[in-house]
Amino acid sequence: MSTAKLVKSAPSELLYTRNDLDDSVKTSTIALLNQLVVDFIDLSLITKQAHWNMRGANFIAVHEMLDGFRTSIIDHQDTIAERVVQIGGVALGTVQIVGKQTSLKSYPTTIHSVQDHLKALAERYAIVANNVRQAIGKTEDEASADILTAASRDLDQFLWFIESNIE
């Protein structure tokens, strides 16, 4: 099959799929999901940055907790990115795109205490959790909403755990 048959003609730029969602639903859902792919990639990297660089009371408990969070975030990120492709989009997750489009403030690299990291993480986890909840309400694709609902449950739990460790 030629490439021309795989790509619909402009302006929609959707890849061919037999998925019968309306093209406008696909396009709007792809935009929502790709923003979340960016945010999840950034959140996973921020989580690892904190994991590597914290010191102080409760270090090992928080250090290990963050490893589990990151694994789950990466799993959700993968599911969201794959949904983009399933409905005819291109998942956008390069470091250049993440750097330009993330919803998150730059993570401070000059903090070291567990408490400072927890506060910085709580702020960023809340942003992503809230963005996911908003996207659930905006998408007209039930399968995407279901994927986001699962991610929302985990992010809310992670935020709760982080906030519960802040003194």
Swiss-Prot record:
Alphabetized InterPro entries for the sequence: DPS_DNA-bd (IPR002177), DPS_DNA-bd_CS (IPR023188), Dps_gammaproteobac (IPR023067), Ferritin-like (IPR012347), Ferritin-like_SF (IPR009078), Ferritin_DPS_dom (IPR008331)
Binding site for Fe cation: H51, D78, E82
Subcellular location, record wording: Cytoplasm
EC number(s) from the headed UniProt entry: 1.16.-.-
Predominant localisation class: cytoplasm
Gene Ontology molecular function terms on file: DNA binding; ferric iron binding; oxidoreductase activity, acting on metal ions
Statement: the UniProt record of this protein carries the keyword Metal-binding: yes
Reaction(s) catalysed by this chain's protein: 2 Fe(2+) + H2O2 + 2 H(+) = 2 Fe(3+) + 2 H2O
Keywords recorded for this protein, A-Z: Cytoplasm, DNA condensation, DNA-binding, Iron, Iron storage, Metal-binding, Oxidoreductase
Name assigned to this protein: DNA protection during starvation protein
Organism: Pectobacterium atrosepticum (strain SCRI 1043 / ATCC BAA-672)
Lineage: Bacteria, Pseudomonadati, Pseudomonadota, Gammaproteobacteria, Enterobacterales
